[in-house]
């Protein structure tokens, strides 16, 4: 299965199965999971990057334990809408995951400012110190990314006259 656009991705997800969202960084991959109604995203885990095969095995294990049916990968677009090096890296992650599990639907979601927004919330609303922020910001950013994709999927379903 190729990487899908968000509408194709939404159509490919079976009813009542969650999906995961990823916020890949240089040292970690934040992981979030949706509920089975694809309404709410929640932080799930933080994968400390080692070798790709080990990281992928950890991700697929998390997905299996939650019966997750698809993956949304954050795409850190530049503010002018262009793609930089990190976008290329995240797209490569998606392609590599598909090589290991070609049946899993994968899509990308524009994650501009997701980490900055989560960091701001943690500081301003929750007064979280720097050490604790470092522990949670990536998985919370993954939830932010996944929530955005879920809301777009809901909008697509509503526009098509389908319940979601």
From Swiss-Prot:
Disulfide bridge positions per record: none
Subcellular localization: Cytoplasm
EC number(s) reported in the record: 3.1.-.-
InterPro entries: RNaseH-like_sf, YqgF, YqgF/RNaseH-like_dom, YqgF/RNaseH-like_dom_sf
GO process annotations (BP): rRNA 5'-end processing
Job of this protein: Could be a nuclease involved in processing of the 5'-end of pre-16S rRNA.
Name of the protein described by the UniProt record: Putative pre-16S rRNA nuclease
Organism per entry: Caulobacter sp. (strain K31)
């Amino acid at each position: 299965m190729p990487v899908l656009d968000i509408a194709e991705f939404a159509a490919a997800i079976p009813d009542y199965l969650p999906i995961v969202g990823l916020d890949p960084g240089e040292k970690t991959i934040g992981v979030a999971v949706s509920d089975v109604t694809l309404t709410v995203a929640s932080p799930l885990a933080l994968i400390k990057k080692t070798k790709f095969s080990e990281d992928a095995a950890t991700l697929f294990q998390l997905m299996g334990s939650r019966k997750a049916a698809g993956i949304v990968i954050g795409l850190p677009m530049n503010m002018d809408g262009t793609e930089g090096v990190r976008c290329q890296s995240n797209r490569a992650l998606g392609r590599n995951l598909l090589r290991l599990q070609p049946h899993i639907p994968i899509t990308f979601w524009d994650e501009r400012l997701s980490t900055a927004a989560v960091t701001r919330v943690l500081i301003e609303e929750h007064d979280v110190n720097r050490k604790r922020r470092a522990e949670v910001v990536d998985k919370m950013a993954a939830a932010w990314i996944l929530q955005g994709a879920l809301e777009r999927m809901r909008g697509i379903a509503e526009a098509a006259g389908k319940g979601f």
